[in-house]
Amino acid sequence: GPGIKASHKIDAPIYLQDVMATSLDIAGAKRPAQVEFQSLLPLLRGETAESGVKAVYGAYLGLQRSVTVGNWKLILYPKISKARLYNIKRDPLEMKDLADNKKTEKVIKRLYKRLLNLQKANNDSLDLKAAFPNLG
């Protein structure tokens, strides 16, 4: 689009749904009220270096919840009480689960707290505390 450098890579967290708001902005169309996400146009044009997204929250049915903050991604599977932790900077393909490593215990607890706050903000009623009583 106009004002956007070709082949310019941006390493900032975003939501996939931001693409809709961005497409509408590029097209010059009015954004409908139901489009809740943000346009990435200021980021793409170099007007800002940050997306404004501090934590990426993920939910898949009643089967999975996740949060990504900085280099860390925590994925919880409440039906089987399984947690997985990845350093996505060092391990972008998420091959080495660090959840059982004693050194990452504090990281997991911090991300879990953040995930609970994001659940509340998104009116997500899935009870993670019952499946993960030791994380809180």
Predicted regions, residues:
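C-terminal cap/loop subdomain of S1 sulfatases and analogous C-terminal strand-loop tails that border
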Residues: G3-A6, A12-I88, L93, K106, ...
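Phosphate-coordinating loops and pocket residues in cytosolic domains that bind phosphorylated ligands
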Residues: D97-D100
